[in-house]
Amino acid sequence: MATLEVLRFPDERLRTIAQEVAHVDDQVRVIIKDMLETMYDENGIGLAATQVNIHQRIVVIDVSEERNEPLVLINPQIIKKDGTTVSEEGCLSVPNSYAKVDRAETVTVAALNEQGEEFVLDADELLAICIQHELDHLQGKLFIDYLSPLKRQRIRKKLEKEAKFAE
C-alpha cells in the first residue's frame, strides 16, 4: 500500500470528470487500498479518486468513530434524494477552509463494492453529506463551487499564499 498525493485547489486536475470503472480487478483494489491509506493518513472521512489524480469513479468513506468501517463506492450514482440540510464542510483538497453547504438530508446510492457486486445504500446525516460531497468530486465539482464568487476568490488567494510559504 502507498500513500498518494492529494491534489490541492486550485489544481485544474480536480475539475476532471471521472470515468466509469470498466472492470473491478486487482488493479482497482490496489487503488482502493491506497486511497483508504491516504484518507486515514490525512485524517479525512472521504476521498474521491480524482483528488489523488486517478480519474475513475471510485470513492472511499469512513465516518465511524473508530475509523474502522470503510465504505467503498465504485461507479456510484445517487438514485434518490430527500429533504434538505445545511452542513459545514471542509475538504482535503481545500485545506483549512470550511463553508456551509446545502445538501439533501438523505440519499440512496447505487454502486459496486470492491468485489464488483452491486449494492444499494440508504444514507442520512454525516454519511449522506459525505457521499454527496465525494460524488461532486467525481463530476469535477468542489464544495467551494457552492459559494459566492467573492468567497471562492478569498479561499483561492489564501491557499495560493499558503503554497508560497510552503515552498
From Swiss-Prot:
GO MF annotations in UniProt: metal ion binding; peptide deformylase activity
Top-rank EC class of the record's enzyme: hydrolase
Cited InterPro entries: Peptide_deformylase, Peptide_deformylase_sf
Entry annotated with the keyword Protein biosynthesis: yes
Active site, per annotation: 134
UniProt remark on cofactor binding: Binds 1 Fe(2+) ion.
UniProt keywords, alphabetically: Hydrolase, Iron, Metal-binding, Protein biosynthesis
Superkingdom, natural source: Bacteria
Reaction(s) catalysed (UniProt annotation): N-terminal N-formyl-L-methionyl-[peptide] + H2O = N-terminal L-methionyl-[peptide] + formate
Entry annotated with the keyword Nucleotide-binding: no
Role summary: Removes the formyl group from the N-terminal Met of newly synthesized proteins. Requires at least a dipeptide for an efficient rate of reaction. N-terminal L-methionine is a prerequisite for activity but the enzyme has broad specificity at other positions.
Protein name as it appears in the record: Peptide deformylase
Record lineage: Bacteria, Pseudomonadati, Pseudomonadota, Gammaproteobacteria, Alteromonadales
